[in-house]
Regions:
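Alpha-helix-loop-beta-strand connector modules within alpha/beta enzyme cores
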Residues: 6-31
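C-terminal alpha-helical cap/extension of soluble enzyme domains
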Residues: 24-96
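Catalytic beta/alpha-barrel core
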Residues: 1-5
Length: 96
């Protein structure tokens, strides 16, 4: 794994070794590439390494979804009846 290695150096290493090289920010001449999926999808706030390409910006939508979930749990509106399994009263009484 070659991470944050200048592309010409990564190319030299890739040509010089008999094992496959995997690049993360090491240019296109490695045998394979990897990106952290949270970085790819824009889920991380703040500074991203130069080699990260955002294929989507899901971070804000995910934070909003988690906030809405937490708010509904605290307010007691989730889970509602439609999100809960019911049970016949007679079957419940058999357990006591």
């Amino acid at each position: 794994v070659l991470e944050c290695v200048p592309a010409p150096l990564a190319a030299l290493v890739s040509r010089s070794v008999s094992v496959p090289t995997i690049g993360i920010g090491a240019g296109p001449d490695c045998d394979g590439q990897v990106l952290v999926w949270q970085d790819m999808l824009g889920m991380v706030d703040g500074l991203s390494p130069k080699f990260v390409k955002h294929y989507a910006e899901l971070g804000a939508a995910m934070r909003q979804a988690f906030q809405t979930y937490a708010d509904e749990v605290r307010a007691g509106t989730f889970p509602a009846t439609e999100h809960t399994y019911g049970m016949d009263e007679k079957d419940l009484e058999k357990l006591y």
